[in-house]
Amino acid sequence: MFFEQAIANNLPNYTKESDSAYGETLAPLEYKEELKVKNAAIREFWDVNRLARGPQPIIASPMPRNYRTTSKRQVEMKPGDLRFNEYDSILEPEEHNAIYRLLFDKLITPAYKPLAYALNWIIIRGTYKYRVVIFNVKKLDASIVRKLKQIAEVLQQCPYHVTAAHTYVDTTESNYYLEAKRPTDTLNFKQLYGPRELSLDLGHFRLKYPVTGFSQINESQIHNLIKSASRLLGLEKGDHFLDLYCGYGLFSFALGEAAKSVLGVEWEGPSIDCAKASARFLKKNYKFIAGKIDETFVQMRLPRPIPGEPERILLDPPRKGTEPGVIRTLALRKPVRVLHIFCGTDEIPDALAEWERFGYRVKEVLPLDLFPGTPHLETLVALERK
């Protein structure tokens, strides 16, 4: 069974035929009702797929609506007709919608026609306190640069706390809002004004990450995510902590204080550079390396476990899951505890079967509602050796 089918099975009749755009199937519901649907759906998914250890109740999102810190609009310009091919969403902050309306009103004027024709996407990223705007363009010449600088001045003066604006050149005109993959260099990335990095304030420290890098879309749930991961992974003094798909080091820095050593791995070069800079600034003896996490990488690039010294592994792969052979090679390291984080629920059955096959059993399953209004969950699964 797929998780979206379980969601559909538990939806009230009046929302089953709802015309919710872009997968926001549950957005019309009151949040209390949405949680009831999701809790019933994850239990049904678990039962039908005969998975071990039923899930705990879902941890609710502190902000169930207007929570998204990243949003985007695809720009389509035809003679006499400018369109943003996405619509305002109640899952996005009102400030995002206001910025898009401001930009639309500028781009529709004759003076900004060259820029309107050049645009692929407009992206807004940031936090609940400030925003950064990225203009993804298919070409860049002197006239377009002038218009970008003019529109950047408008953003600086607007009341929506737009602290930076940048241009990203994507000549492929791809359907991805940055490009088919996130950029690993800065050749096509141009600064209009403001810092080139974003930051996440975690209270006792602040982490920087690249404006093109991956970050959690629901800032309001990050505290619950870290708290839950800390409890489930259970790092102790003397443990070696291996943080795979670490991004800019969120879990490495939030959980790694108790560990004897921390090694973070991420394929995205700019994010790893930010993690290294944070380690230097915080004077932490952490190590970060860049590389594609596949079977060969785990076998050949990761340092071998130290006999007699426990290792705990956290892996937070993309929605498609891990590459073939990764779980097997990680299990051969014999970590005392694994925390596997899933943002794609449908990947869970196959992954848990593989962990089981190589000597690990489920200890606890904890879903978080990281994506309110949509038929998706972030699920934390703690595993231990049999």
Provide a role label for each language-model segment.
Residues 130-143, 172:
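C-terminal lobe
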Residues 8-12, 20-121, 126-130, 141-142:
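Extended interfacial segments that mediate partner engagement and assembly in macromolecular machines
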Residues 1-15:
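General N-terminal leader/first-domain-start detector
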